[in-house]
């Protein structure tokens, strides 16, 4: 790892829970969201702070973790293991939590905040420490389930005109072929994908096969999050490539999935796999199989979005990610700097760490809970 030799100490931590209203109603096969509860972890050391965002939800709909469970684990287990300690690098912070199983999203909050803290201590951009070299990354948009086909086409048109380089439609049983057909007829040449969020079973293979007609880049996570065998069987029955999201929580999962033929693309979400170090390992495994990765989103504020952008500078991020402009989601973000795409390209924030600054003044107005921890 580059830039070794500079130790850093974690002296204190803050847990902040904020509530941000979304600018629009976002519907997936999981349900409808009108706001986002945003748990933040802020690590302090030697006059510098590193910040990370938790992407778990109030209920265990995406993976097993919940906000309440993650915060309990931070308070009672993870923070006591690192506060007051000095570390050589963020991977050493992750190693301090190595005896505990699972809970990758909670673990990622600690590890990602440590990466930001270390990068700021060194005065180096996070992406550089991770091994990335891009100054901007390709981005697309993820569009929720709309009221009808025309509403879908109108929303797609709006984002195509803004220059986004990939359109992803959320689908579910009963709302799949119709919006895809309408979108493809209106936009024959766009890069189009769909995301099912595990809403189907192998019995729906015939229905999903109908999507082969519409030149999709991939179908994302059509089947159960823990079923690689059926994903592999589905991949044999349809032409459209499968992209795995929830099914891949580690580099080991990625190796199994790709070896089985359960998918040919991986949606890499840094929090889902436990942090940046494991994300790099997933990235490398996928690259060894010739499988591209792209960075998925979880309706993050600018804190999580900045982490995602820096991770996306690694070379095997070869498809547009979900890191679209923050202004799509929020009237006001939790950071001071705007994260705005131009013609489908998101500039990588410059400066040490994630390159963004927490807007403490605004954060105070949307904070629901706050606590401080010291060694």
Swiss-Prot record:
It comes from the Bacteria. Changing residue 313 to C: Retains 93% of wild-type activity. Changing residue 120 to C: Loss of activity. Changing residue 343 to C: Loss of activity. CDD domains: NAAAR. Changing residue 60 to C: Loss of activity. The active site is at 170 (proton donor), 269 (proton acceptor). Can be used in concert with an aminoacylase to produce enantiopure alpha-amino acids, a process that has potential industrial applications. Introduction of inter-subunit S-S bridges is a feasible and robust approach to increase the thermostability of the enzyme without losing catalytic efficiency as long as the active-site remains viable. One of its GO terms (molecular function) is isomerase activity. Its EC number is 5.1.1.-, 4.2.1.113. Changing residue 56 to C: Loss of activity. GO terms for biological process: menaquinone biosynthetic process. Transmembrane segments: none annotated. It catalyses: N-acetyl-D-methionine = N-acetyl-L-methionine; N-acetyl-D-phenylalanine = N-acetyl-L-phenylalanine; N-acetyl-L-glutamine = N-acetyl-D-glutamine; N-acetyl-L-tryptophan = N-acetyl-D-tryptophan. Homooctamer. Acts as a N-succinylamino acid racemase (NSAR) that catalyzes the racemization of N-succinyl-L-phenylglycine and N-succinyl-D/L-phenylalanine. Can catalyze the racemization of a broad range of N-acylamino acids, including N-acetyl-D/L-methionine, N-acetyl-D/L-phenylalanine, N-acetyl-L-glutamine, N-acetyl-L-tryptophan, N-acetyl-L-leucine, N-formyl-D-methionine, N-formyl-D-norleucine, N-carbamoyl-D-methionine and N-carbamoyl-D-norleucine. Also converts 2-succinyl-6-hydroxy-2,4-cyclohexadiene-1-carboxylate (SHCHC) to 2-succinylbenzoate (OSB). This is N-succinylamino acid racemase. It comes from Deinococcus radiodurans (strain ATCC 13939 / DSM 20539 / JCM 16871 / CCUG 27074 / LMG 4051 / NBRC 15346 / NCIMB 9279 / VKM B-1422 / R1).
């Amino acid at each position: 790892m580059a830039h070794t030799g500079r130790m850093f100490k974690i002296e204190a931590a803050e847990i902040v829970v904020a509530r941000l209203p979304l600018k629009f109603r976002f519907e997936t096969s999981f349900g409808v969201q009108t706001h986002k509860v945003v748990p933040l972890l802020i690590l302090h050391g030697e006059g510098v702070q590193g910040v990370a965002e938790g992407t778990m939800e109030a209920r265990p709909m995406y993976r097993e973790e919940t906000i309440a469970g993650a915060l309990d684990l931070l308070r009672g287990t993870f923070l006591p293991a690192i506060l007051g300690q000095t570390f050589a690098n963020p991977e050493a912070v992750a190693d301090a939590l190595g005896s505990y199983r699972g809970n990758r999203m909670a673990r990622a909050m600690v590890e990602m905040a440590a990466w930001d803290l270390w990068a700021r201590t060194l005065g180096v951009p996070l992406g550089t420490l991770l091994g990335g070299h891009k100054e901007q990354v390709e981005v697309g948009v993820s569009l929720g389930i709309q009221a009808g086909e025309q509403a879908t086409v109108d929303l797609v048109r709006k984002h195509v005109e803004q220059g986004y380089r990939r359109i992803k439609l959320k689908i579910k049983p009963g709302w799949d072929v119709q919006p895809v057909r309408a979108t493809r007829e209106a936009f024959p040449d766009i890069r189009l994908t769909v995301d099912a969020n595990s809403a189907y079973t192998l019995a729906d293979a015939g229905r999903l096969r109908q999507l082969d007609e519409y030149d999709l880049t991939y179908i994302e996570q059509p089947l159960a999050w823990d079923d690689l065998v059926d994903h592999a069987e589905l991949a044999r029955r349809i032409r459209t490539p499968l992209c795995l999201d929830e099914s891949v929580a580690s580099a080991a999962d990625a190796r199994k999935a790709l070896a089985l033929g359960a998918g040919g693309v991986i949606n890499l979400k840094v929090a889902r796999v436990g942090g940046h170090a494991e994300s790099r390992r997933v990235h490398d495994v996928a690259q060894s199989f010739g499988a591209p990765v792209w960075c998925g989103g979880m309706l993050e504020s600018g804190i999580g979005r900045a982490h995602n952008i820096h991770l996306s500078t690694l070379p095997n991020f070869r498809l547009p990610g979900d890191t679209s402009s923050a202004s799509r989601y929020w009237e006001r973000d939790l950071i001071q700097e705007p994260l705005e795409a131009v013609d489908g390209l998101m500039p990588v924030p410059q400066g040490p760490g994630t390159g963004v600054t927490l807007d403490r003044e605004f954060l105070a107005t949307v904070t629901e809970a706050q606590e401080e921890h010291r060694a």
